[in-house]
């Protein structure tokens, strides 16, 4: 099992930080990734586990009790092909992208998911359409 050993650094854009770590781990075929936890990151990881893109995740308390750490395991097939083929951040700190539920995008014609931040919390585009809620498009995962 391969794990990351680099020191954990805070990032000003938690979505970009998480997506970059997922993408780099996917390309390097790492099993386990560790990052600083936030409510938004945990909500995104819950969606990715529920949709089958990640195996699992665990939130741990840091030894100094100042910051929580989240560790997650990427999911691979028996041939070591990652379940996540790609991730793309859509809404960024300098340019937020909001859409009503009628105009929420289909990622790869429904084969991927869009992660949406709504007034009811973070959810996939499919759930947002069912609830008829629009929101900020955080990322695409396929």
Curated annotation (Swiss-Prot):
Record GO terms (molecular function): rRNA binding; structural constituent of ribosome
A single GO cellular-component term from the record reads: ribonucleoprotein complex
Assembly and partners are described as: Part of the 30S ribosomal subunit. Contacts proteins S5 and S12.
Q: Give yes or no: UniProt keyword rRNA-binding.
A: yes
InterPro entries on file: Ribosomal_uS8, Ribosomal_uS8_CS, Ribosomal_uS8_sf
Question: Superkingdom of the source?
Answer: Bacteria
Q: What does this protein do?
A: One of the primary rRNA binding proteins, it binds directly to 16S rRNA central domain where it helps coordinate assembly of the platform of the 30S subunit.
PANTHER family per UniProt: 40S RIBOSOMAL PROTEIN S15A
Native source species = Mycoplasma pneumoniae (strain ATCC 29342 / M129 / Subtype 1)
Sorted alphabetically, which keywords does the UniProt record give? Ribonucleoprotein, Ribosomal protein, RNA-binding, rRNA-binding
SUPFAM superfamilies named in the record? Ribosomal protein S8 (SSF56047)
Record family assignment: Belongs to the universal ribosomal protein uS8 family.
Enumerate the Gene3D superfamilies for this protein.
3.30.1370.30, 3.30.1490.10
The molecule here is called Small ribosomal subunit protein uS8
């Amino acid at each position: 099992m391969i794990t990351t050993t680099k020191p954990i650094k805070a990032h000003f854009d938690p979505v970009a930080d998480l997506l970059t770590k997922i993408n780099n781990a996917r390309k390097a075929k790492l099993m386990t990734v560790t990052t600083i936890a936030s409510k938004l990151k945990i909500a995104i990881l819950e969606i990715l586990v529920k949709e089958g893109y990640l195996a699992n995740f665990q939130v741990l308390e840091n030894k100094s009790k100042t910051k929580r750490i989240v560790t997650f395991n990427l999911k691979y097939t028996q041939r070591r092909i990652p379940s996540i083929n790609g991730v793309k951040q859509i809404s960024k700190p300098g340019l937020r992208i909001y859409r009503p539920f009628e105009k929420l995008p289909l990622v790869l014609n429904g084969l991927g998911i869009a992660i949406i931040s709504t007034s009811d919390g973070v959810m996939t585009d499919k759930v947002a359409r069912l609830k008829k809620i629009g929101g900020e498009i955080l990322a695409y995962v396929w």
